[in-house]
Amino acid sequence: MNKILIAAASSGAGKTTVTLGIMQALKKRGFAVQPFKVGPDYIDTNYHQAITGVASINLDSFLIDDDEMLASLFQKHGESADISVIEGVMGLFDGLGTDRDNASTSFIAKCTKTPVILVVDGKAISTSAAAIVDGFNRFDPELKIAGVIINRVASENHFSLIKGAIERYTDVPVLGYLPKNAAVALPERHLGLVPQEEMTELEAKWELLSDLITTHVDLDKLLEISKSSENLSTSKAQMKVADFSGLRVAYALDAAFHFYYQDNLDLIRLTGAELIPFSPLEDNEVPEADFIYIGGGFPEIFAKQLNDNRSMRKSILAAHEKGIPIYAECGGLMYLGSSLEMEGKQYEMVGVFNGISKMTTRLRKFGYCIAEPLEETLIGKKGMSIRGHEFHHSVFETTETACMKLSKKRDGEIVKEWRGGYQKGNTFASYLHIHFYQNPAILMQMFGAGKR
């Protein structure tokens, strides 16, 4: 199985840009590329899929606290491709707390036995780049840097200085560089990168990136490195789940709601349930279903359109009142509230929960956390431990009673606790994004309610 992992010394060094360029260049050479993303991010994976035509898979060792399961999922998705390309997250050794193996890119590299290509930001640096590469190469004896790509290089002469220094002071090969070019920059939004659905002229960007990578990076050497990787020897069986054949699961899928982990959707299909997409923006009503799943996204950007689609809002509220189970994450919670406040205006939402979502100018919650239901809920029984991730700028002001205790830990110590998550009838909503592969009991609890 050929594989590489694109990592960086820090966030903002150019991992995504380099990764996308490599994916496009490999695709143009005729390779079938399977993309992966370290961590819980939903947005970079949209870019990956736009280029490769294949769903990108999240590899997150916090959300799935089972090394063998992670390796098994990686193997399952990558074995039929010509090459697997993993995009890292943050800096190579950054994760949860100070443990370099806790939810970090480096841990995923070791778990999947994948060679690491380090992206170094070349802006305003020359010989010091060698110190960065040498330090990263020595930091973990179990992990070696297989190659380096320099980003944001000012000129050929600038690249020669950096390359010469790295090759003089380390034994890590320099595979090439990307020149500074504003045309390949990706604009940002409050949740990170702008979703692919709203980008224009994407194909031109991908083509430019591909041309730059092909011109300035030794792709043959990169492919050689990918072939030198160790094979995985994982025998972990796929998660055993109950049979829910015949269960109809309607899930929101449009520009406002599209944050879903591909493995979650695959696991739903593995139960035998039927996934039926619908659009809260465009459709008149929710499809006839036994279960409704509303993922995250950007309801605030489409608040007026969601407000104006009264028939859809009424049909979801009617489904709730009939007792059809509804599970909603983050943007889904905002949609199920009474209203959404955006730029001083209020827009009516579904109204399952009595609460107003208000957008703020900063991140309100960010990062991994552990949730514990304080009562029986749609996603878990009282006292159950559920791993998740929150990332949002909105606050949900409500009179509803929260049904979960949430906490953040750093290096074994609880650093923050709060309450969240709301259960009303058979409807559950929270800001928490979860991965179903962490525990089969979560999906069984949810679909069990839909089957009754």
Curated annotation (Swiss-Prot):
Top-rank lineage group of the source organism: Bacteria
Example GO molecular function term?
A: cobyrinic acid a,c-diamide synthase activity
Pathway note: Cofactor biosynthesis; adenosylcobalamin biosynthesis; cob(II)yrinate a,c-diamide from sirohydrochlorin (anaerobic route): step 10/10
Q: Which PROSITE patterns match?
A: GATASE_COBBQ
Q: Which residue windows are transmembrane per the record? A: none
Its EC number is: 6.3.5.11
Q: Where is the GATase cobBQ-type domain?
A: 248-441
Top EC class, one word: ligase
| InterPro entries, sorted | CbiA/CobB_synth (IPR004484), Class_I_gatase-like (IPR029062), CobQ/CobB/MinD/ParA_Nub-bd_dom (IPR002586), GATase_3 (IPR011698), P-loop_NTPase (IPR027417)
Q: Which HAMAP family match?
A: CobB_CbiA (MF_00027)
Q: What is this protein called?
A: Cobyrinate a,c-diamide synthase
